[in-house]
Amino acid sequence: MNFLLNDEKTISDNEYKIRKELYDTFITLPSDFLSRMRHFQPQIGCFNNCSFCSKFSVCKSEHWNESTIRNIISAIKYAALNYTHDEPLLAWNRFEHRLGVIFPYLDNDIGSYPYLDKFIELGYKELGVKTRISTVGFSRHNLRLNEMHKFIASSNLIMALAGVRLSISQYGRVYEDKNSNTSLEEYQHDISNFLKIYKPYYDKFG
């Protein structure tokens, strides 16, 4: 078992070791761990601290980089092949709620995750799952996030999306001063920017 993903020809010895250890752990768990998984988070915590959120997340965030995403998805893929050879290779037995769809958020805002495009792409190409995203938005001045979301909403990944939800909130505590770059007026422009970026998705799927 080489633990390679479809776009990989080789991996380092350390990556192989990590993937093997994850695989060995996953196959000791009940098959429901994979077959009925719903929340699959590459990020925890949230900078926004919105007052309406019921999760009481802390105002800091940690997340997986692309290497970690690859290692975990590889281990999931090869573990799932012990139970099924048909896609999706995750959440394939969750018939009561959106079979084959993963939710990468619970106590976090996935819209601010800087590797979301890689997470969605690898989940779709390697596991055959679609991803639903939910966010309160992001600054239109953040070039990295804007380019990433434009890529997600383009023809490259649009079929890998299972829903795009925008929660209307003034980013909790940070959007308060009307004279700053985090004013409510700025937030309105950010919402407009978000809807413009994801217009291709809404046009295609409603």
Task: For each feature predicted by the language model, list its residue ranges.
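Core AdoMet radical
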Residues: 37, 54-70, 79-119, 123-144, ...
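Local cysteine-cluster metal-coordination motifs and their immediate loop/turn environment
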Residues: 45-57
